[in-house]
Amino acid sequence: MPQATYPIKKFADLRMYIAADMFRYMTSTRAKAFLRAWYIAGFRYTFFMRCCRYYSHRLWHRPLFLLCRIALRHYSVKYGFQIPWQTDIGPGLMIGHYGSIIINPNSRIGINCNISVGVLMGLTHDIEHHVFYYPTIGHRVSLANGVKVIGNVHIDDGAVVGVGAVVTAGLDKDAVAVGVPARVIAHTGSAAYVGSFHPATIPLMNEAVKASN
């Protein structure tokens, strides 16, 4: 499994990740907003997913880790989300509606991304060289209903992938892609789809951009 970019090792990190996820739904981090967000399937699932990731790091957290894994498994079956807690996902994840979503645990998803019902992120296998390839998603990326992202594919920051598209090749920054296979039809970016995000995630995105240059 690739080295984690978003390990959530400190309790302050856990609070920030949960707040960033909640902000994507409620545009607020107040206690009342948390109570309203708790009834949203996507937020409830990511809450336990983040907790699993945090509590997995220390032996004395093992009881809480096991409880969170049980809760995560329950909501995985209830909502149809197959997003393992080990998956490397940045803060500010928004899951639109509940239904089948399948993410390979070795995939990587950036900060402030949208995932919709029917999204699949899967591997490809180079049989000759015995190598597996997994998708990576940048920041502020929006994947619409039924999108499939397969294999050694990188979708750059700000990209939008339309309903039912199958992505088998990389997409550049702010690309808008549709179809099977996905083809770029514009470079207008994802601002209209991603919307507002938690201020604490902005420096994280800036640091990630600097690190990639």
Indicate where each model-derived feature is located.
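C-terminal segments of enzyme domains that contribute to small-molecule binding surfaces
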Residues: V131-I150, V180-N213
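Right-handed parallel beta-helix
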Residues: H125-H129
